[in-house]
Amino acid sequence: MKRQAIATALLLIASAAVFAQPRPFTVDDAMRLRSIVDVRIAPDGERVAYVVSTPNLAKNEHEGALYLVDAGGGESRRLGEAVRIFNTPRPAPQLRWSSDGALLGLIGFSGDKPQVFAIPLGGGASRALTDSSEGVSAFEWSPDGKSLAYLTRDPMPAEEERQRKDKSYVIHVDAPERATRLVVKRIDGGTPRILTPASQYVDSFSWSPDSSVLAYSAASRSGFTAQYLTRIYSVSVDGGDPRSIVDRTGMNTRPQYSPDGRMIAFISTNGRSDIMSTRSLDVVPAHGGASRRLLMDDAWVNELAWARDSKSIYFEPNDGTFASREHMFEQPIVRVWVDDGRAGRVVPGETVDYSLSLSADGRRLAYRAVEGRTMGDVFVLDAATGRATKLTDVNPELHDLALGELKSVKWRSFDDMDIWGLLLTPPGWAAAGERLPLIVYCHGGPGGGFTHGLFPQFMHTVSQIDPYPTEAMASAGFAVLMPMPRGGAGYGEAGQRAIVNAWGEADYRDIMAGVDAMIARGIADPDRLGVMGASYGGYMTSWIVTQTGRFKAASTGASLNDLTDPYFLSDGGEFMVDYFKRPWENRESYAAHSPLTFAGRVTTPLLIQHGENDRRAPIAGAWKFYRALKAQGKTVELDIYPRGGHVLFEPMQEREEMRRNLAWVSRWIRSEPPKAASPAH
């Protein structure tokens, strides 16, 4: 009996050990992951509200759920379940606390329109605070808690509405779009008051500390490229003519009053309007005057928040722009002092931070951070000690999955310039003579990049799912190299300008030097190479397979194959002028840098993926490249995703896109998972 008990115990221990082994990561695992899309600390600093986005395959949408957690730690609790968080195309709640902390505002659906809802923290039913016919795109409580300011489009003219109903409506391309207005409304009722003229398209705003004035940024037209044509104004909540605060060319946006009301901080390209211009941080007197640039380096500012003493500003740099070279894969929260512009990191380590907010006394700072191989969690930082506390674990199942090792790598390019990248290797792989099939993943942009995290390119795009399932590829035995060539983030503004009139030149050579380095180091098998990427990464993928036959498989998504297409057909066409001038001014260069010109050289089996309604990278380019390759007997397949834009937003399509990419590289490269499971070095 005793022997039987011992045998049973040993069997149970062995079984537990088997079940405890981490299992491989799959595409379906990627579709179960949750993302934190918004974080906001309460004014008293004692609670943090956040929203989690979850893919719902049954409904084919990404759903948002609101939670509240104590800043000192503990269990999160669900809030506001009666409010359906705005999720077109993805959850975008824009959490905002009232100044007394009694109400939590967010954007949710009222019918099919996004409106501002207030959720009482002391109990009671949620209620809609706005009833805009066109919905609300942004809002802010007034500091005194009496009013709400928000953005909404002008309503559709009655005649246009009639024409749309009877199918007689015609789109007049030169007709101005309806303006986005800044509106103010008292919380206790009353008629909303429009504060801005129909000639302005407002994109951001903030309240003055005394609740009497609103500062806002606006362009004279709408559209994607209008972000580089913004000015800053202020207007009284009682109405009247707007006052010009910053009047210069380029981007001037995200105005934020200092707590003492004397200054306005804003993001600016300092008089330049091309896409490569550094988005720095400036301050200007609240009533107008000469502005002053605080950051003299190449940091691109994303979000900002004043310290409560008005002496410094916290900000988040866009990925790879504040810390260059080996730190380019980080996105730390940074603090800059207004008096002399000195700046330093607030959050140390390999961290990628977003959605920062401060308590009313400035002692606590809440944010979303991606640390290690995660999708991000909620953290609270003690401003005095610099100690950060993790409050959530939104994807605990990651602890049961075998994840690859992600590390930064460096190599020398053709001109001896150091180029950096990230290298993902399979779980348990050790550099012991076993070469791996290598997939090169090209980032978008051109000014984009990679950061640390589970989906290295899309950690900065809230709840966006990567079309290339790098972690599932690692589990299938692939290594994935994510190069950061010049032209993208990490090398300053000069690095971005290095590819002007030269796409596919130095950037291509930087990438290929990385491939050669991985082969020379015994990591990559030179006979099992693949390449993939979307947007500019799609362009680079298409370009690579026209320049070399070294790759056995390629997948190009949302790609630019004929460079005249984005100028003539894209919503961002003017940005092509920044790189190549206009097509009739530089015809030879447009052709010389277009993959379509060299379609006859392609020998690599190519998968082309494109959203049917892509306005950024027109689908015409996918069709042209496909037809050119097909007519010449090349191995090519074209997948078109109905309703899809420049990226896909429907979970069913996202899953299929990932499956197709994994199946394509597996088919042509025929990877096998590593046989050994020795510890990674």
Language model segments and positions:
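Hydrophobic beta-strand positions that form the internal "hydrophobic ladder"
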Residues: V48, G101-L104, G145-L148, L214, ...
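Beta-strand-rich domains and repeat architectures in extracellular enzymes and scaffolds
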Residues: D28-G64
